[in-house]
């Protein structure tokens, strides 16, 4: 499933504790500002944490614009995960343009 960053923003208030926002940008990009509560894991290494991600309700995978999120989401789905939602349209670039909060 693919959603936009706007849709993710709209879902934030109703997110469950079992849901995860997975930011697959570089650690440098992540430290310059990220969605509150997001976890960082580079898109190249997400398959290595697939087993750990099984315990989450829904994992929302995002990046700067959408490309790395799509690659990471495919890798996780290929690892057998069914709880992945790719935030493939917009990413942190749009998040910043909208002036939405970061930490």
Where are each of the predicted segments found?
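Rhodanese-like catalytic fold shared by cysteine-dependent sulfurtransferases
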Residues: 1-20, 27-58, 67-103
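Short, surface-exposed ligand- or partner-binding patches at beta-edge/loop junctions that are enriched
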Residues: 61-63
């Amino acid at each position: 499933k693919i959603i936009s960053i706007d849709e993710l923003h709209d879902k934030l208030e109703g997110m469950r504790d079992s849901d995860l926002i997975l930011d697959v940008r570089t650690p440098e990009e992540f430290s310059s500002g990220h969605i509150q509560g997001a976890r960082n894991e580079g898109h190249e290494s997400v398959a290595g944490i697939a087993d750990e991600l099984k315990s989450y309700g829904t994992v929302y995978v995002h990046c700067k614009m959408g490309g790395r999120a799509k690659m990471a989401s495919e890798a996780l789905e290929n690892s057998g995960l069914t709880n992945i939602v790719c935030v493939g349209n917009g990413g942190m670039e749009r998040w910043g343009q909208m002036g939405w909060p970061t930490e």
